[in-house]
A protein has these predicted regions:
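Conserved phosphate-binding elements of NTP-dependent enzyme cores
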Residues: 1-941
Length: 941
């Protein structure tokens, strides 16, 4: 009898405190708890790690070295495990060739469909291509001028690897004397040995002829032989290098354009048989972007209009200044003329050069003038020429991608784009969103023969499109690049792909699949998770969404606090059991005993506005948006409605450029008014505060510098001549040199995971003995870094500068975090709160705008309450907080809502409504308003 439970005993990974738990198999199980309580440690670092490790250990040691080996979790016992599949928040491939269609494998089925029932057309006239008769071929060949010498060849190998010795033997046996190999003609006895690792093309020369009026009979015989040998294809090459291809398979009778039998690889933009020859299937080419080189056209050349090194100064002693000044005399501009005032010809000369014309100029070096003749190649051409030189990587930031001029971004060759199914070519079909594509296949009319051929293919395509729709991704197109997807979108795509694979008996572990999903689409996601469970799988979800928890079979609540205060199973059972449990914080929110209150009144703001005009990035439809300043503002809308395009691509990038002098490039818009009311923009996301174990909350907030300076002021340090640098574990001097200040040493185990052992010299304290002997209030630098924020607050209570920074960390709910805790061990929510604390500790001007993209990711309802307290503190100081959010608890507390939509993708990109939560709740067109209404009491609406 199969096991009914997954049993874990003595789990001690990270902050887990000897956890024992039983998880029912073949059920939908939710792990929940505060950010940093140990949910991910139990789900991913224990359950998934052990499930994956056991699978990998069943393989040979040779195979294991090619697979990601996971550490053995620190636990006593675990059984009832199934093979584990993790579907986490990491974005999909950044490979520019990867698309939604290829990741979901729908594109593979589409290629098969087009190869089997696609109708070819002539790419020139658009007429349907039919098979070419032998007489038609002969008529076209007979049109060659009299006296033309030509060869008739049969292609027998087309771009295939190998030595192809049998091909040459068969040609000899057939009585043929010559072959063309990779474009070169050889007698059969002198063919070189081919490289079997390279692709080769081989044509057998069937006949060599001279065009005469009486040649038709011989031509007919030779052509029939050639077509038989070349599987219906014949190639004619004239002595001047001209070539004609004929096909018994498909060819346009009017233009003579022939095609081989359709095959799936011809529809792949990753194959030379189908890819656009100009861009090799990329659909775009990299060029120097004018808008990146000259980001602000209101500036002059002398004022720093050109953002590229080497062109920023235009003084007499600069290399380019005198030359551009000479060009300007011809085209009516000076070094002090704003770029926006240049004539069209003048701007073209500046950017693209003046050809071969020479200018007589004087360059000054060290006060001495040197005369010379020089030509001007143009800024863009100069940058392009430097790309391939040493140090050319610098110029990559000034490059941009533009659609390929040959295929217009369609990635495929014209012949392949001329093949249609249901009147659409494969690019046009992939450019439809998921809903439209599904409708296309449901309405597709086929002949009985086509239906028989395509039945199974269409079944798979419809099912996979349906899965994408069921996880709330109906607005995506199959042509969308994978690298442009958000973490939540990428995760739901992988979820849809897993459903398509129809595996049974697997343990799926998902990390907050509801991220980035509007409440409207949440029920679809829950249905999908239930479908995965009902096919015979165990589905474990790390989640904070109340709707998902209520739909689950079993909840494991981890806590009671976070970090050192967490790591225990507070409650486990059905949603009803959790709601009744008095010690469960999750139960308190689920049952309504605790809730985030609606503010009694909304802020009035300072009366100023930030106005975005003509926003057109991605799917935004030329919208104008007013953002009130001095308020807590929420941008809402279904997935794909244009929130990130408006806030991140346009507003954040433009404000960063104008206020922070950042080198950013905003999306398409006309203007932003009201920037003069702000002096700084701060983006606070959930990315790690550092990528190495050496970074920690103390280094990020600047607290470590203050602590080191404090230790350098102690009598002991002064007596020994120690400076603040002595107390850094990042530089030589005070650190332990055996572990270079890491506190641990890494021992490589090759096909086993690397082992980290505590340094036996400093015993994990990171500093050498001399440094540790320096004490402040009886504590060494290591002792201070090992304190929690809570302990540090008491210890440094007499030091206002340190206490203020520690107090803000404590206020955002990070009292349990150690001052020197490695940043790599912090969750996304914890990293975000460290950033918020850093901002809170600064003395603000009240003219800052804080931009946050889904700040509640990974946060429990209780964490959300703390986050809202911090965000409101920022607003109380006169600042503006702008968040993109789906969490209704955050939306209901906002002062102002900007709701985009109404749908995602093409159906979005407009402003549905704006106003207070009460006003939005009354809007009939707003999906956000519909779900917001029940949360606001009737007296408030």
């Amino acid at each position: 009898m199969p096991a009914q439970y997954i049993r874990i005993k003595g789990a001690r990974v990270h902050n887990l405190k000897n956890v024992d738990v039983e998880i029912p198999r073949d059920k939908l199980v939710v792990f929940t708890g505060l950010s940093g309580s140990g949910k991910s440690s139990l789900a991913f670092d224990t359950l998934y790690a052990e499930g994956h490790r056991r699978f990998v250990e069943s393989l040979s040691s040779y195979a294991r070295q090619f697979l990601g080996q996971m550490d053995k979790p620190d636990l006593d016992f675990i059984d009832g495990l199934s093979p584990a599949i993790s579907i986490d928040q990491k974005t999909t491939s950044k490979n520019p060739r990867s698309t939604v269609g290829t990741v979901t494998e729908i594109y593979d089925y589409l290629r098969l469909l087009y190869a089997r029932i696609g109708i070819p057309h002539c790419p020139v006239c658009g007429k349907e291509i039919r098979k070419m008769s032998t007489d038609t071929m002969i008529d076209q060949i007979m049109e060659l001028p009299e006296g033309t010498k030509f060869m008739m060849m049969a292609p027998v190998v087309s771009a295939k690897k190998g030595l192809h010795e049998k091909v040459f033997d068969d040609a000899r046996k057939g009585g043929y004397a010559r072959v063309r190999v990779d474009g070169f003609l050889y007698p059969l006895d002198e063919v070189p040995t081919l490289d079997k690792a390279k692709k080769h093309s081989i044509d057998v020369v069937v006949d060599r002829l001279v065009m005469k009026p009486d040649i038709r009979r011989r031509l007919s015989d030779s052509l029939e032989t050639t077509l038989a040998l070349g599987n219906g294809i014949a190639v004619i090459e004239t002595t001047d290098g001209g070539e004609m291809r004929f096909s018994q398979n498909y060819a346009c009778e009017e233009h003579g354009i022939g095609m081989t039998e359709l095959s799936p690889r011809m529809f792949s933009f990753n194959s030379p048989f189908g890819a656009c020859p100009k861009c090799a299937g990329m659909g775009e080419k990299q060029v120097v972007a004018e808008f990146k080189v000259i980001p602000d056209r209101s500036l002059s050349l002398r004022g720093g209009a050109i953002a590229v090194n080497g062109f920023k100064t235009m003084e007499e002693e600069s290399w380019n200044g005198p030359l551009i000044e000479a060009v300007g005399k011809d085209y009516g501009f000076t070094l002090d003329t704003p770029i926006k005032d240049y004539t069209k010809e003048g701007l073209h000369a500046l950017l693209y050069g003046t050809g071969s014309k020479k200018y007589h100029i004087t360059r000054f070096f060290g006060g001495f003038g040197r005369e010379s003749l020089a030509s001007w190649n143009g800024i863009l051409n100069i940058i392009e020429s430097r790309l391939t030189q040493a140090g050319g990587e610098y110029y990559n930031e000034f490059m941009d991608f533009t659609p390929c001029p040959e295929c217009g971004g369609k990635r495929l060759s014209p012949e392949i784009l001329a093949v249609t199914v249901g009147g659409l070519n494969i690019y046009e079909l992939c450019s439809l969103n998921v809903t439209s594509a599904l409708r296309f296949f449901e309405e597709l009319k086929l002949t009985q023969t086509e239906e028989t051929i395509a039945k199974e293919i269409l079944k798979e395509i419809r099912a996979r499109l349906g899965f994408l729709q069921s996880v709330g991704l109906d607005y995506l197109t199959l042509w969308r690049k994978s690298g442009s997807l958000s973490g939540g979108e990428a995760q739901r795509i992988r979820l849809a792909t897993q459903i398509g694979s129809a595996l049974v008996g697997v343990m799926y572990i998902l990390d907050e699949p509801s991220i980035g999903l509007h409440q409207r689409d949440n029920s679809k996601l829950i249905d999908t998770l239930c479908r995965l469970r009902d096919t015979g799988n165990t589905v474990i979800v790390v989640e904070h969404d109340e709707e998902t928890m209520m739909a689950s079979d079993y909840i494991v609540d981890i806590g009671p606090g976070a970090g050192i205060h967490g790591g225990e199973v507070v409650a486990a059972g059905t949603p009803e059991d959790i709601m009744k449990n008095e010690s469960s914080l999750t139960g308190a929110y689920l049952s309504g005993r605790k809730k985030i209150p609606v503010p009694e009144k909304r802020r009035e703001g300072n009366g100023a506005y930030l106005t975005i005009k003509g926003a057109r990035e991605n799917n935004l439809k030329n919208v104008d948006v007013d953002i009130p300043l001095g308020k807590f503002v929420c941008v809402t809308g279904v997935s794909g409605s244009g929130k990130s395009s408006l806030v991140n691509s346009i507003l954040l990038n433009e404000l960063s450029r104008k206020l922070n002098r950042a080198h950013t490039f905003p999306g398409k818009f006309d203007s932003i008014e009201g920037i003069e009311n702000l002096d700084k923009v701060v983006s606070i996301d959930q990315s790690p505060i550092g990528r190495t174990p050496r970074s920690n909350p103390a280094t990020y907030t600047g607290l470590f510098t203050d602590i080191r300076e404090l230790f350098a002021m102690t009598p002991d340090a002064k007596a020994r001549g120690y400076t603040a640098g002595r107390f850094s574990f990042n530089v030589k001097g005070g650190r332990c040199e055996m572990c270079e200040g890491d506190g641990v040493r890494c021992i490589e185990m090759h096909f086993l995971p690397d082992v980290y052992v505590t340094c036996d010299t400093c015993h994990g304290k990171r500093y050498n003995q001399d440094t540790l002997e320096v004490k402040y209030k009886g504590k060494s630098i290591f002792d201070v870094l090992d304190m929690t924020v809570e302990e540090g607050l008491q210890f440094f209570s007499s030091m206002p500068k340190l206490a203020r920074k520690l107090q803000t960390l404590y206020d955002v709910g990070l009292g349990y975090v150690k001052i020197g805790q490695s940043s790599t061990t912090l969750s996304g929510g914890e990293a975000q709160r460290v950033k918020l604390a850093t901002e809170l500790s600064k003395r603000g001007t009240g003219k800052t705008i804080y931009i946050l993209d889904e700040p509640t990711t990974g946060l429990h309802s209780d964490d959300v309450a703390k986050l809202l307290t911090v965000l409101n503190r920022l607003c109380e100081n006169g600042n503006t907080v702008l968040v993109i959010e789906h969490n209704l608890d955050v939306i209901k507390t906002a002062d102002h809502i900007i709701d985009l939509g109404p749908e995602g993708g093409d159906g979005g990109g407009t402003v549905v409504c704006t106003g207070t939560p009460e006003e939005v709740a009354m809007c009939e067109r707003s999906y956000t308003g519909k779900y917001l209404k029940p949360l606001l009491s009737k007296t408030e609406i």
